[in-house]
A protein has these predicted regions:
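Glycine-rich phosphate-binding loops at beta-strand->alpha-helix junctions
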Residues: 16, 49-57, 181, 201-217
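Active-site regions of enzymes building and remodeling cell-envelope glycoconjugates
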Residues: 26, 44-47, 71-72, 91-93, ...
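Active-site neighborhood for divalent-cation/phosphate handling
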Residues: 76-117, 123-124, 135-136, 171
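Adenine-nucleotide phosphate-binding core of ATP-dependent small-molecule kinases
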Residues: 167-202, 209-212, 220-221
Length: 244
């Protein structure tokens, strides 16, 4: 059970913000967007805030949410050397992205075995944590949309409409398919190399593009769409107990 009964977790990613509401240990609803559409019936006792955005953008979001819920306790989550039974691999632990840290914490508590954590969003993030809770490190690679956007922004004549991206068999026979499927192949190759080394580990996946990409990999895995929010709840609740 949470230290506080009603909890709002804010996961501010690079391109979208995810709001997850908890009542004790139950997820009530999840909302995505650049701003919070207030649920007048839900007033959180506490807000756990995790952001990979700049200090300036994080401060603006903080101010907006605090205006909506002036009486709610606010906790900003940061990456640490040790928390929730997990040891951070980084020599400068605060430099590990908070989204990665929360994913590792949640995966360790869910699996309790050697685990690979994959978050497929703006970037593809992979972290490895052993059954003792030792974070072994990980990787960051461009996500599918980022790869496509980078290619289009750095070339003069690779152009197509989104409507041209349609599934087909065999080698791509259009620019749209060549780019889309080429980026998928790069991402799959990256993940397949990691799988060759860690195929005996449990794989836990999250993120908006996880389903479409990892279904092609043929890996036995556990899907957890709210993994980062679960990690935020674990870390925030631990900090709340320690500060009582």
């Amino acid at each position: 059970m949470s230290v506080e009964s009603r909890l709002l977790v804010i996961d501010a990613g690079n391109t979208s913000i995810k709001f997850t509401a908890f009542e004790d240990d139950e997820v009530l609803w999840v909302q995505r967007g650049e701003s919070y559409s207030a649920d007048t019936e839900f007033v959180p006792d506490v807000i756990y805030f995790a952001s990979v955005r700049s200090k300036e953008l994080s401060a603006l979001l903080h101010a907006d949410i605090q205006a909506a819920f002036p009486d709610s306790k606010w906790v900003t989550l940061t990456s640490q050397a040790n928390a929730c039974g997990v040891t951070n691999a980084y020599s400068e632990p605060e430099r590990l992205g908070i989204d990665r840290w929360l994913g590792v914490i949640a995966a360790h508590h869910l699996i309790r075995e050697d685990a690979v954590v994959v978050d497929v969003g703006t970037a593809i993030k992979v972290d490895v944590v052993n059954k003792k809770g030792v974070h072994l490190g990980g990787y960051i690679a461009p996500g599918l949309a980022m790869m496509e956007e980078s290619l289009l922004s750095k070339t003069a004549r690779i152009r197509y409409d989104a409507s041209e991206v349609v599934a087909g068999e065999g080698l791509p026979n259009s620019t749209a398919r060549a780019v889309s499927e080429g980026c998928h192949e790069m991402a799959l190759g990256f993940l397949e190399r990691i799988y060759q080394r860690y195929q005996d580990f449990q794989w836990v996946v999250t993120g908006g593009d996880a389903e479409s990409l990892l279904s092609l990999l043929g890996v036995s895995l556990e899907r957890q769409p709210n993994l980062v929010a679960m990690g935020a709840k674990l870390l925030g609740d631990e900090e709340g107990r320690e500060n009582k």
